[in-house]
Amino acid sequence: MSRKSQNRLAPRAWSFSRGSFLALVLAWFLLVPGSALAGEPRGDATIFIYHHFGDERYPTTNVGMDQFREQMAYLAVHDYQVIPLAELVASLHDGKPLVPKTVVITIDDGYRTIFSEAWPVLRKYGFPFTVFLYVEGLERGYPNYLTWDQVEEMAAAGVDFQDHSYSHHRLADWPPGMKEVEYRRWIRADLARGAAIMERRLGVKPRFFAIPYGEYNDVVLSEARKAGYEAAFTQDAGSVSDDTELFLIPREPILGTDWASLEHFRQVLERIDLPFADMTPDFAPLRENPPARFGARLLYPERYRSDSFGIFVSELGWQQAILEGDWVYIDNETSLNRRINRVMISARERDSGRTALRFWMLTNPSAP
């Protein structure tokens, strides 16, 4: 094995304020000029995550159907290999090199427009896809969600269904005053309930877990492993490489206006992973505030242009980073006030000029 080891009825992806959301969009577009799209493809994969299809009631998590058709046509015309999620996970688990231009399509929550809008398009192209189900939404018959009859029809036709938890709680929100043993028990019970219902309904125990809202900490990931899942998926943007951790697999959200455009879709496909380890701060609940430093140890520092490294923190924006040996970092004196921050390290690949990046998440239990 390689190094990888609405409202209530409408769970939303990405818990950013509008300002930080737009700041992140701007940072990405600044980092990916047209020249970065050149070069031979490396064996990285892209996992897309969708939510609503053709449902303008939910503009922040919706993709228009004209946009979706255009995106699927782009994959077909440009010879991208759209593979089942299980095939990608098997490659990571076995240390098998990834094939260039590999794509996986995932859809979170289980809204009814998957059945009425997305499935006919995906079936037209013969593209496999995985739906991560918010189990309580189906069990209680919430409006806009798939019915179990629809799920069973799709499953019989080969659609893959996996677990997105029972309650869709923000599992990384460690309740104040709750002891760790109680916190773990709460997470464990929710995961077990959702998985048991899926197994009873579909006859198969779910193998993969998409973390609700993409929000995690070390306890959430630990309990996902203990629950018997083979892999866990975040909503951190980024590509998948041979060095991707099995319980921190990133996915690229396609939603809203800018992030559902074909331009953004193409840019996402051209990005590559930037493998690193020993992040500071790591993704355990924040222990020091302000964090004295943001950074990580690069696994392959020689791959990248030494003057191209930058670090983005949701609350602080993008800064030019310092590279010392295999360490890349920025020093910091500013306290973090948000409950969730995402940290990104980015650079330009030396040979191709393409943008390489990777994210991780910080949780701040003391935030209001």
Model-derived features: positions:
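N-terminal secretory signal peptides that target proteins for export/translocation
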Residues: M1-S17
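Bacterial N-terminal signal peptides
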Residues: S20-P33
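N-terminal pre-catalytic segment of deacetylase/amide-hydrolase enzymes
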Residues: A36-V103, L269-P281, S352-P368
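Metal-dependent polysaccharide deacetylase catalytic core of the NodB/CE4 family, i.e.
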Residues: G43-P59, H78-Q81, V99-V103, Y111-V219, ...
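Short, compositionally biased P/S/T/A/G/V-rich stretches that sit at domain boundaries
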Residues: I254-N289
